[in-house]
């Protein structure tokens, strides 16, 4: 059986449908990206454009992103976990959605981080500090250790996605299904996420580079801290969001959504023995590209043609934070109160109120600002197909037509 056939069979094994649109204790805006493009063009927003950008990038690095962490995901240990995950089919536990994303999810592109690490590794090329004898290890312009780093980056990201799918049992409703299903799903989420993190740590040790280990360890610490802050700011059960400025939002977003990619890009340069200046430019690209990617995700509920695709949205997302900043705290709380109907928040009404303000357009400008900063960082790399692919990724997450 071919690898592609195996993936398709596993996809059917996990089922085709996802759980209903529902708010758990964690944020549902997990770096999703769809219907995006470049502000420099006038094409309509379409997932096909993003898929084309990713497909062309994969050809350049010679490594399909969808297979990035497949060796780990198809291991004997995780195969046993997959057998247990099958028992969740038919329930509403969010772990199922994440599991299906491992197999095929062109809309969310869970493997974006690893692909970017490979692209920036190829764009930078070998360092002059590397001896010619070390270059034999390169395939398609990328060292094997850099490919391993890309897989490790994906394992860490995937593990955090799995852990973020843990359901807060104290907030369950009768419509969520049996309590025993949610308890069982939580156990599997904890175990499988820990397994992926353990494999990532093992892979880091095998790289035998203490600076890289330190970078990725600090990225993991940032992720945990950022997710904790997000959960603390969650508006579940409380319609009044935190009073935060966009500067605070950016600090929190860097921790939870940007640090892993930024530090992985820097680590890839360290593995190739590039100097500090090149490492910093790689870090800046990863940081600003990830930031624009997150802002694009936050904007989707406000720019999608079909409002039914996003009935709810995060009240601590970039457009909402900017809307509150322009409006003032008191008027914002008043608008939330006016959108209340029978004790529940009418998101459709609140969305239209936010769209009428300056928050959405300001968020688009902020997304483009970080996109431009990412492009500026790329100017330090020599022109190449890999650099062009990195530029196209930025164009794709900053198009709003």
UniProtKB/Swiss-Prot annotation:
It catalyses: 7 isopentenyl diphosphate + (2E,6E)-farnesyl diphosphate = all-trans-decaprenyl diphosphate + 7 diphosphate; 6 isopentenyl diphosphate + (2E,6E)-farnesyl diphosphate = all-trans-nonaprenyl diphosphate + 6 diphosphate. It is an enzyme of class 2 (transferase). The keyword Transferase applies. GO terms for molecular function: all-trans-decaprenyl-diphosphate synthase activity; prenyltransferase activity; protein heterodimerization activity. Pathway: Cofactor biosynthesis; ubiquinone biosynthesis. Keywords: Isoprene biosynthesis, Lipid metabolism, Mitochondrion, Transferase, Ubiquinone biosynthesis. InterPro entries: Isoprenoid_synthase_dom_sf (IPR008949), Polyprenyl_synt (IPR000092). One of its GO terms (biological process) is regulation of body fluid levels. It is found in: Mitochondrion. Heterotetramer composed of 2 PDSS1/DPS1 and 2 PDSS2/DLP1 subunits. This is All trans-polyprenyl-diphosphate synthase PDSS2.
